[in-house]
Swiss-Prot record:
Signal peptide range: none
Keywords per UniProt: Hydrolase, Lipid metabolism, Membrane, Transmembrane, Transmembrane helix
Protein name (record): Phosphatidylserine lipase ABHD16A
Upper classification of the organism: Eukaryota, Metazoa, Chordata, Craniata, Vertebrata
Cellular localisation: Membrane
Enzyme Commission designation: 3.1.-.-, 3.1.1.23
All residue ranges annotated as the AB hydrolase-1 domain in the record: 281-407
Amino acid sequence: MAKLLSCVLGPRLYKIYRERDSERAPASVPETPTAVTAPHSSSWDTYYQPRALEKHADSILALASVFWSISYYSSPFAFFYLYRKGYLSLSKVVPFSHYAGTLLLLLAGVACLRGIGRWTNPQYRQFITILEATHRNQSSENKRQLANYNFDFRSWPVDFHWEEPSSRKESRGGPSRQGVALLRPEPLHRGTADTLLNRVKKLPCQITSYLVAHTLGRRMLYPGSVYLLQKALMPVLLQGQARLVEECNGRRAKLLACDGNEIDTMFVDRRGTAEPQGQKLVICCEGNAGFYEVGCVSTPLEAGYSVLGWNHPGFAGSTGVPFPQNEANAMDVVVQFAIHRLGFQPQDIIIYAWSIGGFTATWAAMSYPDVSAVILDASFDDLVPLALKVMPDSWRGLVTRTVRQHLNLNNAEQLCRYQGPVLLIRRTKDEIITTTVPEDIMSNRGNDLLLKLLQHRYPRVMAEEGLRVVRQWLEASSQLEEASIYSRWEVEEDWCLSVLRSYQAEHGPDFPWSVGEDMSADGRRQLALFLARKHLHNFEATHCTPLPAQNFQMPWHL
């Protein structure tokens, strides 16, 4: 009876993976008493095939879930319509509640029938036995056998806790349950006294900004968190996850962040290979509709690196909602997991981000300054110009206020706090992070990210002459035109390197540098072009084109 109840309440099972020889326990090691032997039959190496009763019951419950999601998103319009028609009176609501209660009872009955179907299936009974054993005792053998199954991630046991590192338990400098530290925007009116009257005047605007951010704004910014989109992408995500596990020996793990969100991760270990880059770990930060199952992790994987992918809060197996604070909390536990559980030193970690993932990447670079390098592909400096691009001009004040208070993705500000090597990849046909049209390459916000970084690190070089010549170089629409501008100013790379190395030897590596202070205008132009070319590479493609492995290069450093 207990097993039947477990089948009724158990998670949905999607796939049973092939048994990987590299993960099997050595023959000399006896199994623990709590371990449950997983099946090795090749007939199970496929998507889980439910019996007819479970299959039909699952279809009914999935359809009900979709209808509930549609009802949730359309509820404001539905309530408005019902109110206008006078259907929200007590005499109309009571019968409706009876219908809703009856429907819930019917769905509960369908769930019980699904449980009976699972109970009659030996594959599911074997799976639920392993899952229960793992929850009782998270031994390495139980977790190894559980990894052979792909199921609803909500039932996956937590593998790593944000407080697990001993250094955080002993010190008070780590994150609290309220979250990690973020850079906050400065008040718009610093000289205005924050009186009670001013607070009351601001209250309607603050309420409006909050509602916009938590309804339309968040879903526009992170469409991957919308349930209906995830439901449509589920087959693709399952296929991508199977590829990572079966072909790349990926290991899935659930991390618990300081805000209580559970973060879905996938780790591919290449340290045992002959390739030297396998000793380096690339932490991948996906875009606003990207998932590690089908996202940018493929680029460093093809290049031979060890890779750690993770999903934003609210994406696929990760819980929560993707607001900046939750995003930073998630990134923090991912980096901690890489250091304290996977055993990588910060000097062996590379942060790689695509598009909106630049926010968490730059936050990690700012918060963990010892990481080896940062690579930002198709990213931007600040969210406000991009948000204003897609909203009406009459909403400018509301959009700016909402972004600054609730969705402040200040990539450039965070990146300037990092002292290590940085590489920016600009898509020359990018249609997403341009503020006008894709053909107008100067409206690409990656340009502004580069300029802000160089102006912070080399303020004397990026004075009038240097800034002007870098802008000309950024306007180049082809490699030929770019090379023409570079050669027009006769940039001597050996001279530029000697100047920078001499300054570093005398003054140390910490930015900002005052190099170029006593330099001629021609020298500043040469140095500015040299630095711009080292920090930004062009890739002739649109925003969503996968980055080829040969374009995944380590940033330049002295």
